[in-house]
């Protein structure tokens, strides 16, 4: 009995010391409103119970406490904001370049340590090295890939015409994966069997889901717990399948034929990574990790952006008809018509539709930054060093204080120049902002617009599912609890 009492006393003393050592943190953090949660656990239990509905979890507290709130993950503070002014403070601060280390660990444990996982001071040099892979002249050289793979997609969609409502998401994912793999790794990847049969889409989807699980339920990152639950084997099996494709292509790059600067593939991701490998700056495994992460980041978001745009237009036929009229004016002949960059620049209405889609259903629902030093926000609040701040894109884009009482409604006219002039520049952040914004934002817009040109010019889209009935799932990338089926009818 004495031993138990002694242990309890020692434990209590350690807990008091722990709280006392963090008194400045608590003093500063408790100035921010938000749910206190349970003792010791904070809001962790509610997070675990509602981890598939965390968007509604954040909606509830942002509406209750204001646009910047404090939650507690156990003893760890986590700030969430939808306030454009605070978003600007974070994205523009040199002390907020680092991503949350917890999220970085969750992703790199599944996909390796690429650009996405780099922190200060290393991320900037790596980012500069890969910037040429996303310059416009290189993106324009990808048009033949967009064209070929979109033709394959259209041939598949043709088989669904007048067949009732069908699930188009798997086809969208395969279409986008094949484009992302080729634009990341070059034409050699087309000869890989896993690429040809599209089986790697499921493996990448599994890794993305596993990364999300690591983020939302940190205990799963423990190797023993992961093994007991079977997640470790599942991750290893899927990663192994992806590695085989990566090895097949990367091995051919170790001793390549000389390339000239005029070679259109000289600046693609794999070749930029191989430059670092030959200099001894990164390992062979790092080359594969860069390719793996770039493919994963590129294909999932582009595919679902196209799908979400189709679904929203199916729910708003007047806007779909306006898009069709615009497309018909630029591409009078249906079928497999050619698309050039000047053609795409004429499509102002379609551009606004894509932007409005990304406002309502952003590809990434939330991103997180960790303060490297104390950061003073424009509202006067001081955020201590080491605190994680979640920039909630989903709720920033639906903030009624910025977008008005109809913030949840689909309206492409939100992006008319005269309407955007009235908005805070950080009110719309689908690809983040600042020095560490999304490196592939132009690629995502270009590939999505290309596919939507062909699909919406050739088909009328409808659905029996209402937009208001969508259930959003908080994932590493935006997901829906269920993907409504779409009906395709041919246009002339």
Swiss-Prot record:
Annotated GO CC locations: endoplasmic reticulum membrane
Binding site for heme: 438
Taxonomy, superkingdom: Eukaryota
Obligatory cofactor(s): heme
Protein's cellular compartments: Endoplasmic reticulum membrane; Microsome membrane
Keywords: Endoplasmic reticulum, Heme, Iron, Membrane, Metal-binding, Microsome, Monooxygenase, Oxidoreductase
Alphabetized CDD domains for the sequence: CYP313-like
Bilayer disposition of the protein: Peripheral membrane protein
Coiled-coil annotated spans: none
GO MF, any single term: monooxygenase activity
EC class of the enzyme, as a word: oxidoreductase
Listed EC numbers: 1.14.-.-
Gene3D superfamilies: Cytochrome P450 (1.10.630.10)
InterPro entries: Cyt_P450, Cyt_P450_E_grp-I, Cyt_P450_sf, Cytochrome_P450_Monoox
Function: May be involved in the metabolism of insect hormones and in the breakdown of synthetic insecticides.
Record-stated family: Belongs to the cytochrome P450 family.
Protein name, per record: Probable cytochrome P450 313a1
Designated gene of the protein: Cyp313a1
């Amino acid at each position: 009995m004495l031993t138990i009492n002694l242990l309890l006393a020692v434990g209590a003393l350690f807990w008091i010391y722990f709280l006392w050592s963090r008194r400045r943190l608590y003093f500063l953090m408790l100035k921010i409103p938000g749910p206190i949660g349970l003792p010791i656990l904070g809001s962790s239990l509610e997070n675990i119970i509602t981890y598939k509905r965390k968007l509604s979890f954040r909606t509830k507290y942002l509406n209750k406490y204001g646009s910047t709130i404090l939650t507690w993950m156990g003893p760890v503070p986590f700030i969430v904001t939808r306030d454009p002014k605070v978003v600007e403070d974070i994205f523009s601060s040199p002390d907020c370049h680092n991503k949350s280390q917890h999220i970085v660990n969750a992703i790199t444990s599944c996909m390796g340590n690429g650009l996405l996982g780099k922190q200060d001071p290393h991320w900037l040099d790596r980012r500069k090295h890969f910037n040429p892979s996303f310059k416009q002249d290189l993106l324009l050289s990808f048009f033949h890939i967009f064209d070929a793979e979109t033709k394959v997609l259209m041939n598949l969609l043709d088989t669904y015409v007048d067949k009732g409502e069908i699930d188009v998401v798997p086809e969208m994912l395969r279409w986008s994966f094949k484009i992302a793999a080729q634009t990341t790794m070059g034409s050699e990847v087309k000869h890989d069997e896993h690429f040809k049969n599209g089986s790697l889409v499921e493996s990448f989807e599994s890794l993305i889901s596993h990364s999300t699980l690591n983020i939302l339920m940190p205990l799963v990152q423990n190797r023993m717990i992961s093994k007991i639950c079977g997640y470790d084997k599942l991750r290893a099996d899927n990663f192994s399948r992806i590695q085989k494709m990566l090895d097949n292509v990367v091995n051919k790059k170790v001793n390549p034929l000389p390339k000239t600067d005029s070679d259109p593939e000289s600046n693609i991701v794999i070749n930029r990574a191989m430059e670092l490998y030959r200099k001894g700056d990164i390992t062979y495994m790092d080359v594969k990790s860069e390719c793996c992460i770039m493919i994963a980041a590129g294909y999932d978001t582009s595919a679902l952006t196209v799908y979400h745009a189709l679904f929203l237009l199916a729910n708003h036929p007047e806007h779909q008809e306006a898009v069709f009229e615009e497309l018909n004016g630029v591409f009078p002949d249906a079928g497999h018509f050619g698309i050039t960059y000047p053609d795409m620049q004429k499509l102002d209405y379609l551009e606004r539709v894509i932007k409005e889609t990304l406002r309502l259903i952003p590809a990434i629902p939330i991103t997180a930054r960790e303060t490297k030093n104390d950061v003073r926000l424009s509202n006067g609040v001081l955020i201590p060093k080491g605190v994680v701040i979640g920039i909630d894109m989903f709720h920033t884009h639906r903030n009624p204080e910025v977008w008005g009482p109809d913030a949840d409604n689909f309206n492409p006219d939100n992006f008319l120049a005269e309407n955007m002039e009235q908005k805070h520049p950080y009110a719309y952040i689908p690809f983040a902002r600042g020095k560490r914004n999304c490196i592939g934002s132009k690629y995502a817009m270009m590939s999505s617009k290309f596919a939507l040109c062909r699909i919406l010019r050739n088909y009328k889209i409808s659905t029996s599912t209402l937009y208001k009935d969508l259930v959003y799932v908080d994932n590493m990338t935006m997901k829906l609890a269920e993907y409504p089926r779409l009906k395709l009818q041919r246009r002339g």
